[in-house]
Structure formats: structure tokens, C-alpha cells
Amino acid sequence: MKTLLVFLLLAILVAVLIGNIQVEACKDLTECSAGNRCMHGRCLPMLG
């Protein structure tokens, strides 16, 4: 059961990473969702 859970988590992580790579580069704050900011062409979560 733990092996299946780990496999699913890894699959989700890979899917998210692939999705982030395919997203076009952002140019300003309005292109990112709430809680994120545009930095170096990518929407990154705001820390702090």
C-alpha cells in the first residue's frame, strides 16, 4: 500500500513539473494566479 502511495505521489509531481515547463513565460503579475508572482519568466509562490 505504501509503495502505491509513493508511486502516485511521484506521478503527480512529475505531471506538475511537466505542466510548469510547458507554460509560457509570464511577463507581469496579472498572468500568475493568486499567491504567486512572476519572476524570471515563471510564476513562483510568494514566500513569507
From Swiss-Prot:
Keyword Ribosomal protein: no
GO cellular component: extracellular region
Signal peptide span: 1-21
Major place of residence: secreted
Modification type Leucine amide: residues: L47
Origin: domain of life: Eukaryota
Prosegment residue ranges: 22-27
Tissue: Expressed in salivary glands. Highly expressed in the head, body and tail with a 2-3-fold higher expression in the head.
Subcellular location: Secreted
The keyword Heme is annotated on this UniProt entry: no
Disulfide bond annotation, renumbered to this chain: C26-C38, C32-C43
Additional notes on this entry: Does not show effect on voltage-gated calcium channels, potassium channels, and tetrodotoxin-sensitive sodium channels. Does not show activity on Nav1.7/SCN9A, and shows very weak activity on cation channel TRPA1.
Function: Leech salivary gland peptide with unknown function.
Family of this protein: Belongs to the annelide toxin family.
Name recorded for this polypeptide: Peptide HSTX-VIII
Lineage, broadest ranks: Eukaryota, Metazoa, Spiralia, Lophotrochozoa, Annelida
